[in-house]
């Protein structure tokens, strides 16, 4: 059973500049709450109560000021700073001590998830005993996303980031179990 989660909250948010020159984009308000609350909520819906948030160097204070240790949400939040955003593999390298020998969920800090059966799907993903699950979703313009090619059983055969020639129309959502 997956009990720990990692949220990638680094990046520079260059497309949201000048707002992101002073504030990490995951701390900007989206509707009635900061963006970072959305991925935290997804992990909580899955039953995950221990979360590691990886942030840019120099932005740790802002996250701690907003979220503290997570107790008021009924969870435990740990933090790590990274010198430079280096993507998904770096999250596992940086979080090695936090992860230990346990399985973890990983979610990008700037994605939204919704759907009628989302909670049930999340709860089934955390029960995964072997292998992994990568949540995918059909899109009309796959060239704008990371895309997965899958076989008839749903096994991922390959993943390409923003392919010029489409492998499929199945976009990688940024949620991994």
Q: What are the residue ranges of the model-derived segments?
A:
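Conserved N-terminal catalytic core of the sugar/cofactor nucleotidyltransferase
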Residues: 1-7, 15-18, 28-29, 33-108, ...
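Active-site glycine-centered loops adjacent to acidic/histidine catalytic or metal-binding residues
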Residues: 11, 110, 138
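Short, flexible helix/strand-to-coil boundary loops that buttress conserved ligand/catalytic motifs
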Residues: 20, 67, 160-163
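Conserved core of the sugar-phosphate nucleotidyltransferase
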Residues: 114-177
């Amino acid at each position: 059973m997956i009990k720990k989660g990692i949220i990638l909250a680094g990046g520079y948010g260059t497309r949201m500049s000048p707002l992101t020159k002073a504030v990490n984009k995951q701390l900007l308000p989206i509707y009635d709450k900061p963006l970072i609350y959305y991925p935290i909520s997804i992990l909580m819906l899955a039953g995950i109560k221990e979360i590691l948030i990886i942030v840019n160097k120099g932005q740790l204070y802002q996250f701690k000021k907003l979220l503290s240790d997570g107790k008021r949400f009924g969870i435990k939040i740990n933090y790590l700073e990274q010198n430079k955003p280096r993507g998904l593999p770096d999250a596992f390298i940086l979080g090695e001590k936090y992860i230990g020998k346990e399985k973890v969920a990983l979610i990008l800090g700037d994605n939204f998830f919704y759907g009628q059966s989302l909670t049930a799907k999340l709860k089934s993903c955390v029960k995964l005993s072997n292998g992994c699950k990568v949540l995918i979703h059909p899109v009309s313009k796959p060239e704008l996303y990371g895309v997965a090619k899958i076989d008839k059983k749903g096994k991922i055969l390959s993943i390409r980031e923003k392919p010029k020639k489409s492998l499929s129309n199945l976009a990688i959502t940024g949620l991994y179990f």
